[in-house]
């Protein structure tokens, strides 16, 4: 396989010598405008984009299917709904999403809290059901599957059934948006951290500033085994709906101590549940389903290292899922644990601005993850209504924004930032070169041998970069605050 991939890259390099590249550019005031043809040069005339030592194969573009996203698209006329789904999920559409993330129980973009079994003490899971999922999540997925029959799926919980937690409630901490007894906040640690974190501005310090001292899951063998069985029941229930789940992660953002559905875990608890219960249970009952360690949203390398350095844990999981602050330690983790597969698991959603700044931010994040070895990329909500408000009172961005009063939708600047990558980098592409900073550039070779260069200038001055294309260079002049894709197969 490695020999065959080398032949593809060599043949692409030889063929690149005679190629010219056409381009398409997006700015804040003008989206998706065709640009000039650019020819290859023997010499670099700008900052040279770094060739990567290991050109990893890209897997899939994904999105999460949430109730509030389903509610948003349902506000549109049938024809507009069909157009949205086609543009997002069709193999010849604009985003070509071919992987879905499924929330197991409610997340923060559910209508409200629910789980598949809220009967206390039901260790045999006799009352387990996915009735709530049939209202929105499953119909949403079915519409995507109709356009992309080969779509794959992975699942993760935000919160276990409330009776499996030490606080017997879905949040981790009390808040005006939930009914949790504030006295239970002491279970986490004495005093709460500053709740005004601003992920959108790329955190400069350590997150979280203080670690939970307690597993919020009840660490009793009956509960641990019942929860592992719960994953299997969820996989089976979705399989009965012809929705195959081939990978799971134990918990969304164990380091976000949330007022919405969540669950804090210690490193010891993570290892115990995954290595002693979840992985062996699924290996026995669902041998085709892989377990990844995720989703990681902390930049505390020592914490994640303490989990993966456990020999049983490292040998049990097949990969690692990272989002938000977790992306900051991607390279270090790959260096120390090269046998694992790394994926990005959730797009950074901002605070409901739906603006050009969000587009530039997402463009840079895709460059960072793919250029540093993440092999899948999952977006969060691809569609939301109005200000993108959750059931717990906070606002987020989406790629498509619905006006509930008018029954219309807008494709946001962030949508086009994603399109600059997703339309041109299919599954099986190799990421061969990358630069970051204010001029993020990514060079990919598709399975057919086509070169794709996705570049941006996020700064206020003109920039000149040189992307390596085989033995030659594509010299690119980038105007300030532009997003551009160059391809020798661009129509």
What would you call each of these model-derived segments?
Residues 1-20:
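Bacterial Sec-dependent N-terminal signal peptides
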Residues 29-245:
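N-terminal catalytic cores of secreted or lumenal carbohydrate-active enzymes
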Residues 63, 96, 153, 248, ...:
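Conserved, mostly hydrophobic/aromatic
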Residues 66-71, 105-109, 159-163, 252-257, ...:
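Solvent-exposed loop/turn segments at secondary-structure junctions
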Residues 223-353:
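Active-site neighborhood of glycoside hydrolase catalytic domains
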Residues 341-416, 433-437:
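Aromatic/acidic polysaccharide-binding cleft in carbohydrate-active enzymes
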Residues 434-470, 481:
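Carbohydrate-binding surface patches
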Residues 478-491:
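C-terminal beta-strand-rich structural cap/linker in extracellular carbohydrate-active enzymes
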